[in-house]
Amino acid sequence: MENQVTQLLKAMVKPDYTACSYAFMQDGKIVCADAIGVIDKINNQPITTDCTFNVCSISKIYCTVCIMQLVDEGLIQLEDKVSDILPEFTMKDKRYKDITVRMCLDHSSGLPGTQWKHFSVSTISKFDYYSEVLNYLSNSTLKADPGTYSTYCNDGFTLAEMVVSKVRNMPYEDVLKKYITEKISAKSTNTTYTIHSDYPLVSEGKKPKEYFPIQGAGGITTSMIDLCKFGQLFLEPNSIISEKSKALMAKSWGTTFLELDLGAIDFGLGWGLVRHHDPDYDFGDGVLAKGGNSMFFSSRLIIVPKYNAVLALSETHDCGLDVPTTLMRLFNTYLEPNTYPDYSGIYAHAFGLQKITTIKSSMVVQDKTEKGWIMSDLLNYSNGKWTNEKGNQIFFEGDYLLKTTRNRTVAFAQKAKKQELNSVWKSRLNKKYIVYDTTFYDIVTNQMLCSVEFNRTEDTLSLIVHGNKSEPVVSEFPIEVIDDTHAQSYLNTPCNGSRDRIEPYFEDGKLYCASYTYICEDDIEPYNSQLFEKENQVYKINNTLEVLPTICENHRILVLDANGDLYYDSMDVEEYKPIESGFIILV
């Protein structure tokens, strides 16, 4: 059975997402971990927890540990000047000689920020990235005196990476392997130049694989389970990094010249947040956090001493998650008892369907769209109601869903009816029914009801209404089958919850619905330059329609696309553009 954390995550991601993975470690053991989606949208191979994600700037913690190891061994000191260790590092601005190793780690170096060229690449071929960085810096100036204020800076960690490689006299990727990943058995954790085929790297959609020559600032790729193994170093004594160095990393080193600025001072050494307190989640004191973002990925690592826990999550951007808050919500769900009411299900309202997923104290509201279910609201439970961040509330009275917005409570939806369909109704599903009897002056079919189709979603039947996609009025009507020829709306929610009742029925091969007559696409003949007749005519466009018939007074042409949505209407003033397929209605 799928765990509740994964159920919640699946309800939150966008329908066309590629991949997402998370892991929780407590007391040194993985207690909950999963991966959803596919490795890429080319081969659609299902993802596993062994697959790796680019965790980007979380790499800065690895780089900082490498530096602190040098400090622990007495090979360097944090206040050493970078230019003394790397004489090849020069800048136009002579103040660069004041930059210390520590300033590279707490973002106060004053360096420009990011050497963007080849920051992210699509090849694992190794090239001299250090030379590119040094050349870029040699033609740059500082944004401030070193140590004046902290502002996010990738360049500092590239220099720190160079320091590690220089002092160890070996490639940075080899340092990581020898001094960190091999010691914690994190086999999936690598850089661009040491990626292992047993731990496939995820790609967003059909985009290229993303690799990072900028290793110290953003080049780590890892599974979430192995990321947790690394995070565990900060919760227990170990031989990899000393307690003294961990304490220094967790200290607030960030600096600012603005009295009320609380952001810059949250920088530790490598850590993005060393005074992490969230108003919605009581994770206690001493929480450390670091995020990472690239062109295709977002990731988060959180250390929670209160629960002796390490939390890790990474997504491809098409998941659409707020990664920091999502990770905290997922872990909170893992911790919570199963004592909350469950109102999960499909709910029907006057304009369509919503899916409610309640998992412990979290509620996810999803709207039905052409692409699938898309999250539209996220709420938390308290005292019989769910409340979102705006203060709007949802609660239930029997099978009815009520909403409170700006102190006004209204009935909004009711539990959707599920119904088995016979072969007659199954044969009608997902076919387009094109309006036949509109008039040259009817604006309604310019906006909606120019075509309809029957759709079944999770055993719930509805009538999809197609119209002007740029100005949609209504999308679908939940209905139930009465007999082989009749269906009807079943909503009886007060206020606006059941405002427009429809009763589609079939007679003599035609569909009658909402005062209009519709013809099934199966019964529509192809368009071959036919002209207007005395009665309305509907045709199917099978070949590119370059030119429309001439329109005289009190006549009208509607062109629908293959999906049944309005593409062109002579009632509007817009110019017609050729379409490859669809329907044409001569009115």
Question: What is each stretch, according to the model?
Answer:
Residues 1-35, 177, 210-587:
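Catalytic loop of the DD-peptidase/beta-lactamase superfamily, centered on the K-T-G motif
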Residues 4, 11-23, 42-104, 143-155, ...:
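Short active-site loop at a secondary-structure junction
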Residues 8, 66, 100, 133, ...:
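Hydrophobic alpha-helical segments typical of transmembrane helices
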Residues 13, 71, 75, 90, ...:
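Secondary-structure transition/hinge residues
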Residues 29, 35, 40, 94-301:
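Short, surface-exposed loop or secondary-structure junction motifs
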Residues 32, 53, 85, 172, ...:
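Conserved hydrophobic/aromatic "anchor" residues
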Residues 38, 88, 315:
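Active-site donor-binding loop signature of nucleotide-sugar glycosyltransferases
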Residues 80-82, 108, 176, 314:
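Glycine-rich, histidine-containing beta strand-loop boundary motifs that form or position
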